[in-house]
């Protein structure tokens, strides 16, 4: 991949570079994904998650930009794995962009085949929100992480993480949310990363409190704050596959253990034991097969240590990076003895159509986001948990790139919020249109048996019709851009997922599209969980009037 040193930053204000606000939104969000404040390696078009890219290569990026600038409001741009391949006449209510990223026929859906295609310039890895142009930095996963640790606290520690120690690893674009999510829940956390730049970045953005290279110092500070029942987050430089076994050897057992290293990609994401970043980069280039094998061996040690901590009483869970699968394939037959975070903590939210709803101020003015915060506090005042989140986010979350906010809203709530936002744009309360989107990690848009659809009640973990149906209904209902991806979060062969974005530009046409899309999108989550036999989903569907032909 050619590295290009250029600073990309989305335009601000109300002057259009394109022929309409929906095209402008797509252009600005693509550029925002590559803002140095947002992207992990913008010079390589990498947004987050190992090699999750916004465009296939720099030539494709420029062609996408040029296409969006000339795209008419009754045309649709098609993007195939980060490359613009066609512009067709459609209609004004159709999506302006349709994206398909990293999709492979199942028999060939593995990293080896993907890398062959990538080398030939035929494919890119889109992760989830990298290739679909709706990544907003670490805040994008923060509330989900906060909810996960909050539910762990409710289930196991009386509702708070005060006086507890969480041990985790991985402080990249996704995992970087963990330190702040734990301290927001009152706990102490040691978060390990092998890359000092990742820790520095989290400290700079106030997601992590302190840095150390010493395990002894990390433990001393953690114990001091744990005894005081005060929160603190400690970024520890090191390799988790070395540090966790060392803690097991010393008989040190944290209260909570998880992991968000980029284990989904053994070649580009995980650093084997005994290698510096520079040595790892050299080996990756010279002998990728050996690198992958060493990575897998290190991951197996990592999981063995997590299992040992679980046996000693630590609440242990997989945080969706497929590390258990790698260890299992390497011969660790009890690798799945600890659960994934979705069945352990998040699925009840999915049954209610809840998920990581996000919005972005295209104006670039933080005041637009603060005004929308007030809408949440006013319109959803009876949801104290949600309002607490908004208050904490305002105080503690620093914007990356265009100002944005995330909060988990459910079926009915998303459409209500979208309507209000569109009205605020229409009457001038907000200075420019708002982009509304979500992660692909949502209630009805993913098939991922080791993550979002792990341990489904009816055994339908691997059924991949649901994300396809999600993308189809969102497209016909008028989402501004829709994406279908493969391999996000857990790597090639293990997931299919869909994303949608809709623009609130203040028009009556947008209001109708928002009503349709922000009803059908979370509605798919309710439907998917009704179909799997979840009582809470059935209750939600009946209460909200979701039309499900065979529901009992």
UniProtKB/Swiss-Prot annotation:
The keyword Cytoplasm applies. Coiled coil: none annotated. This is Urocanate hydratase. It is an enzyme of class 4 (lyase). NAD(+) binds at residues 49-50, 127, 173-175, 193, 239-240, 260-264, 270-271, 319, 489. GO terms for molecular function: urocanate hydratase activity. Keywords: Cytoplasm, Histidine metabolism, Lyase, NAD. It is found in: Cytoplasm. It comes from Bacillus anthracis. GO terms for biological process: L-histidine catabolic process to glutamate and formamide; L-histidine catabolic process to glutamate and formate. The gene is hutU.
